[in-house]
């Protein structure tokens, strides 16, 4: 039952995170211009990098909550410690050279590492169906890419809020 709950939670979180991540990444330029001014256009790339990390943040929340609920708090805390050290090192190396893009990249690297390290310990508690997880990633990922391409295409011809509405319908 715990396995089923974990896999279903993964599915629902992935279904929510992918369209948001792809939609914002595709429309980042228009979103920044709508909310701010052209002065903030350099924030588009960092936004796109950070929003890519949203999917990993969603999944790391699931993995972390799962480990904590299964009495693996020490493991989860250790994972956070390792990721914190990696994040600091990435910022030390990337921030001076790449500025805010480097900081966003460090955050993305940390999000990915948090998922990978947490996922490493999940099989110690349950037997994960990797076939199921990969199936979800491929199906939802493909749908998200199709949505992103259509939103990007439509956004060239209509106001971006209309493109968002279209993306929601897809």
Q: Which ranges hold each PLM region?
A:
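Specific pore-lining/lateral-gate transmembrane helices of multi-pass inner-membrane transport
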Residues: 1-81
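Membrane-embedded alpha-helical segments of multi-pass transporters/permeases
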Residues: 21-26, 34, 49, 88, ...
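Helix-coil boundary and interhelical linker segments in multi-pass alpha-helical membrane proteins
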Residues: 30, 93, 97-102
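Alpha-helical transmembrane segments
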Residues: 63-71, 119-134
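Short alpha-helical transmembrane segments in multi-pass integral membrane proteins
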Residues: 5, 12-25, 80-81, 101-123, ...
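Transmembrane alpha-helical segments of multi-pass transport proteins
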Residues: 83-86, 134-170
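A helix-boundary/kink motif common to multi-pass secondary transporters
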Residues: 72, 98-99, 103, 159
């Amino acid at each position: 039952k715990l396995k089923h709950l974990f896999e279903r939670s993964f599915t629902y979180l992935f279904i929510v995170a992918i369209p948001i991540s792809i939609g914002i990444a595709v429309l980042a330029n228009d979103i920044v211009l709508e909310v701010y001014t052209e002065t903030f256009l350099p924030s588009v790339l960092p936004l796109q990098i950070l929003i890519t990390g949203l999917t990993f943040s969603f999944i790391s929340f699931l993995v972390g909550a799962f480990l904590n609920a299964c009495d693996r708090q020490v493991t989860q805390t250790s994972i956070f410690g390792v990721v914190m050290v990696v994040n600091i090192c990435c910022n030390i190396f990337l921030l001076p050279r790449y500025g805010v893009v480097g900081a966003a990249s460090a955050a993305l690297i940390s999000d990915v590492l948090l998922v990978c390290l947490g996922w490493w310990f999940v099989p110690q508690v349950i037997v994960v169906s990797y076939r199921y997880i990969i199936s979800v990633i491929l199906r939802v990922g493909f749908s998200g890419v199709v949505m992103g391409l259509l939103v990007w295409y439509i956004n060239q011809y209509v106001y971006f809020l209309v493109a968002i509405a279209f993306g929601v319908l897809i």
